[in-house]
Amino acid sequence: MFLLHFPSALIILVPSHRIAFTMSTDHSARSPRLRACVRCQQRKVRCDHKSPCGNCVASDSQCVPATLTPRRRRFQERVLLDRLRHYEGLLRQHNIYFEPLHPQAKQEPVIADVPRDCERSETARAQTPVQSQAVDLWQAISRVTLEPEDDDGDSPDVQADGVENAWDHHVDQPEANDQTGDDLLFGQPQANVNVLALHPEQAQIFRLWQTYLENVNPLLKVTHTPTLQPRIVDAVSDLGDIHPTLEALMFSIYCIAVMSLADNECHRLLKSSKEDLLARYRLGCRQVLIKCRPWQFTNVDGLTAVYLYLVSVSPQTDPRSLSSMLAAALRIAQRMGLHNESTYTRYTAVEAEMRRRLWWSLVIFDHRMCEMSDYKVTTLTPTWDCRIPLNKPTEALFAVVRSELADLIRHTTFHINFVNPVLAAVAKAKDPGHVSISADGEMLTIQRAIEEKYLAFCDPADPLHFMTIWTTRGYLARNRLLEHYARHLSSPAMQQTDAQRNAALSYALEMLECDTRLRVSPLTCRYRWLVDFHVPALAYIHVLNDLRKRPTESHAGKAWQAMSENYEARAMHPKPSGQGVFTVFARVVLQAWGAREIFLRQRGMPVEAPQIVLDIRSKVGQTSSGSSMVPSCSTGEPSHSSIAISAHSEAIPAQMNFTGHSADGQAFPGPDLGPSSFPDVAGPPGMDIDIDQFWTAMDWRLMHTQAW
C-alpha cells in the first residue's frame, strides 16, 4: 500500500499493483520523438518522417534517418580549477605578480597514516609535497593572532620592515649606542682619525675610479657604472657631505683599485708606494664602515663596500680569518634576501640584476676562501635558488660564465660529496641546455655545454675574452681532477688503471698550462691580480706525486716541462716573503726529480735537469753555504750522490709546522691528495693516491707567496 498526499490533505490508500500498472501505461503511451532525416535537415525542409521520405524519393537521394546527437557534457569545474592552479603555479615559478583566485586559501597539510613505529615508507615520502618557499614568520603570526576583520592586508615585507625600523629607532637612542655591536669585527672608531683627510685628491679620485673600471669592474661587475659614476662626481665636489654608505663604497673602490696595480704603477700614477696607499685607504674604509653600521646593512651599496674591502685585503689576510668575515657578509646578504629569487620581484630589472651579481660574487669568493681553509663550509651548495646573472650586455661575460659554472658545479655529485653528502637529496643535476647529466660524466657534460654556449664565441684577441677562456678551462680541469678523486675515493675496491692515472695527470697539466697562458700573455696585465689569486697548487701536488711514483712514464718529460714553464711564468712577478714554504716545496721537487734522474741514468739516457730544478738548486744553495746542493759550474747539475744528499739535507727539514700564515697568505688551496683533505670521504688503504707524512705536514696555501 502507498500513501498518496494531495493538497487537500486527504489521504487515500491505493494498492501498490494499481500504481505500478498506471506508471507502465503512461510510459508506454509516450510516443518517441520523430526527427527529420539528415537530408531534410540539411535542406531545411519539412520531412514526412517516412523511410524513405518523400523529399528524398523526389530528389533521388539516399534517405538517412537522423540520430540523436550526443549531449554536450558540461565543462567540469574541477578541470577548470586544476588548470587555473597550474597557471598560477607557472606565474609563481617565474616571479610574476598576479592576484590569485583564492588569496586567503591555504593548503592544509596532508597527514598520512603511519604505522605505530612512526616509520614512513619511501613511497609515502616521495608522494609528500615538498614546500620550496619558506614560511614567513610575520605572516604566520598575523594569520594566527588577528581576526580576519582586523587584518589590514599588510604584506609580510611591510611587517618585517616595521620590525627593522623599530631596531633602527632603538639603536639611534643615546643610551643604546653601546649595545649596537658595531665594534664586533671592525673595532671602535678612532677618534683621532680625520676621514676626510684620508681621501685622495680629486684628480687621483678619478684616476682610481678609472683604474677600477679598467682592472676590476670587468671581472666582478658588482657596481652599475651609469648610475654610480654621477653619484661619485657629485660627491667629489663636496667630500664633507657624503652619505656614509657611498663614502664606504668609494673607499673600498680606492682599496681594490690600488690592489690591482703593481708597485711601480702606484708610484707613476699616484706618486706613492702601494703599501702606503693601501694602509691609508683601508684605514679610511674601516672607519667609514663602522660609522654606517656594516652588520645592520639593508642596502646593496653598503654590502658591496664590505665585499670590495674584503677582496682588497685578501692577499695579506689569513684565509681562515677572511672566511669568517665572509660568513658575516653572507648572513647580511641572506637577511636582505639576495639568496632568494622570490624577493627580486619588488625591484626593478637593473636593481635585481645587480643584487644577483653581488650574491654570486660573494658566494664565489667565499668558495675560494673555503678551498684555502675548509672546503666543507662553503656556501656553494644547492640550498638556495638565486638565478645566475644575465649576459646582457656581453661586457659582463666573465662574471656570467663563472657564475653559471659555479651554479652547475654546486649541483654535481662529487662536489656535494666533498661538502655535505646529505645535500644530495636536494640537489638536482642540470646544465645550460636543461639536458640530464649522468653521474659518471658530470664534468664532461658541463665542459661541453660551457664550451658550446660561451667559449666558442669568444675572441682570443680580446683581453676579457682571453681571460674568460683560460680561466674557465683551468677551473674546468680542476673540477675534473676533483671528480676523479671523488670517484676513486668512493670505490675502495677499484684500483686505478694506467689510463685513469694518465687522464688525471692530463687534467693537472691542463691547469698548469692555462695558468701559464694567463701569466705570460700581455692581454691579462690588468687582470693579473685575480690570476695571482688562483695558483694551481692542486696541479703541482698531483703532478709531483705522480712523478715520484711513476718516473718512468713517457709523459714525465712533458710534465716537467709544464711545471718549469709555469714556474718561470710566476717567477716573472715574484713576491718577497720568507723561505719556509719554498724550502718544503724545494724538497718535494728534488725528490721527484731524483727518482726521474735515477731512471735516466739506469737507461743510459742523457740527464738534462729542467729549469725548475736548476732554479731550486740555485736558491737552496744560496741558503746553505758550503752545501753540495750548489750546482756545478761546468754542467749546471750536481752529481747523482749530491742529489740524494740535497733531497734529505738538513737544510730542507723533513717536518715543518706551517700553521701560521705569511703576510701574503692567500695562496694555495688547502687540500692535499690524502684522505685528511676530505674528512667526509674515507681514504681506503688500497687507494693509489696515498701521501706520506711529509706531504700532510705541508701547508700548500702559502706556497705562491714565496719568490719562486
From Swiss-Prot:
Disulfide bonds: none annotated. The keyword Acyltransferase does not apply. InterPro entries: Sec_Metabolite_Reg, Transcription_factor_dom_fun, Zn2-C6_fun-type_DNA-bd_sf, Zn2Cys6_DnaBD. GO terms for cellular component: nucleus. It is found in: Nucleus. GO terms for molecular function: DNA binding; DNA-binding transcription factor activity, RNA polymerase II-specific; zinc ion binding. Keywords: DNA-binding, Metal-binding, Nucleus, Transcription, Transcription regulation, Zinc. CDD domains: fungal_TF_MHR (cd12148), GAL4 (cd00067). Pfam families: Fungal_trans, Zn_clus. Residues 37-63 bind DNA. GO terms for biological process: DNA-templated transcription. Its main location: nucleus. PANTHER family: UNCHARACTERIZED TRANSCRIPTIONAL REGULATORY PROTEIN, ZN(II)2CYS6 TRANSCRIPTION FACTOR (EUROFUNG). Transcriptional regulator; part of the gene cluster that mediates the biosynthesis of the tetrahydroxanthone dimer neosartorin, which exhibits antibacterial activity. This is Transcriptional regulator nsrM.
